[in-house]
Amino acid sequence: MPESHVSTLLVGAQQLGVTLTEADARRMLASLDELDEWNQRMNLTAIRERPQQVTKHLLDSLSVAKFIRGPRVLDVGTGAGFPGLPLAIAMPDIQFTLLDSTAKKLKFIEHAAHAIGASNVETVHTRAESFRPKERFDTVVSRAVGAVGVFVEWAGHLCIGGGRLLAMKGRYPTEELQKLPSGWKVAAVHRLSVPGLDEERHLVEVCRSHDKI
């Protein structure tokens, strides 16, 4: 594991206001080693160069850490585990549920979480609109679902009263924000700056219409 990647991750996390130990950083990078190995057998990610993986997978995921509320967080359409797996390493006191409709992706996540000792991660194989958990979640986050309104429509029932839906977006989604389902409102739109990434990033924070902002 090149020390330069450890340093890049630690410095980038610090710039994002996220406190990581060197052990945390090494666990995140170890998860990328597992991703590379599994990616040879199944297409989990098109990003194969390690510097880009650190930036576009790990630091991009950590860019939303300060908006996460616990103790229960759901990552919808987690894919290969982003943003949920890096956030779980950075926030060990919060329970993360990673949901996806593709079983093979969840098999990878279960393997990687076990390999790096992320005991606060569980997986669910279903679609968000079909998921009926015993307890709802304080935060529901996704960087995979398309339009913000669709995300809210599919996953809104999974969020507790007073909780937040967090949609990770690229450019400012002006038109999408005008098409939220009834009963929901935009609490805030945060412009994110991901260290090492020269691309626009925004986080849309959605809550129920009667919730205080």
What are the functions of these language-model segments?
Residues 13-15, 39-42, 82, 126, ...:
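Residue-level signal for pocket-adjacent positions within structured domains
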Residues 76-78:
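Conserved beta-strand/loop positions that form the S-adenosyl-L-methionine
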Residues 1-74, 104-121:
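Class I SAM-dependent transferase core
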Residues 63, 82-86, 104-107, 150:
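Conserved SAM/SAH-binding loop-helix junction
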Residues 12, 25, 90, 179-183:
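Alpha-helical structural signal in soluble globular domains
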Residues 80-93, 153:
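Conserved SAM-binding loop of SAM-dependent methyltransferases across substrates and taxa
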Residues 93-97, 101-213:
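S-adenosylmethionine
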